[in-house]
Amino acid sequence: MTVEIEGVTLHLAHPDELSIQWVGQDELMRQLLAAWMVVNEQDLPMNPRLLGKPGVGKTTLAYAAGRRMGRDVYILQATLDTRPEDLLVTPVIEGGGNLRYVASPLVTAMIKGGIAIIDEGNRMSEKSWASLAPLLDNRRYVESIVAGIKIKAHPHFRLVATMNDDASTFELPEYIHSRLQPQIFIDFPERDEEHHILKENLPFAEERILSYVVDFLQMAHAADERYTVRDGINVGRFAIKLKSLATQRTHETEALEIAIVQVLGEEALRYVRRNRPSAS
């Protein structure tokens, strides 16, 4: 699909289609949707930040909130190498030497009135964030130097950034920090919620495996380890595969312990449940 802005034809990105849903922690969903609300014709939507450890569900929450609003969702993965043109418009040379201007997922969301997720936003440099400064205040536009155009955001456009709390990230400049508000912190889910998430992602898993993984995660959370439900899903999935390919009867616990070591490392075994169920 293409649109024309100030005489320049832009080729738009496709929305992301993911089969995921947000489970539990309804208050976090309420806070995100509230930040995006417009309560008066003079009001503006906010640009929230979702903060937390890797794997706690920040992107899942953002995507599910966008879909709950009935909007298309566009995800832009930020990296250390993300340039301003990657965020906005990229020129591509076609046959015959002609230039084709390709809109980023973020700019496509701006034009179409969708939801833009800047994933792991604090991996981007200040130069890249600076190109978004006018979008994040009451101006709500960006300027593409490459294409020589100004692009205004659709009234229905919404933006959210997810950010990990690890060391391999940049500090946000203050003028961006003040524009990405409110800050919504996502912590580890409660036991019942964690069980529900595992069951949603591993519907073919036996209850004993789900319970074992939940016990492991809850013990790790209590010790302030960084293991997340994403790690639990990987452990459970790998254990099921190991058990299904075994040439002899294999204890579930044996398969789970192998999976824990190979997904998280031997030090994670300190949080395993040592009672071994019968082989099956």
Segments (PLM) and residue ranges:
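Generic hydrophobic secondary-structure packing signal
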Residues: Q31, K58-L61, T228, G232, ...
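AAA+ P-loop NTPase catalytic core and its hallmark functional loops
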Residues: M1-S211, S278-S280
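Short, hydrophobic/amphipathic alpha-helical patches that form generic packing surfaces
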Residues: R30-V39, N234-F238, I258-V263
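Short alpha-helix boundary/capping elements
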Residues: N40, I240-S244, L264-A268
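Residues that form generic nucleotide/phosphate-binding pockets
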Residues: I197, N201, Y212, F216-M219, ...
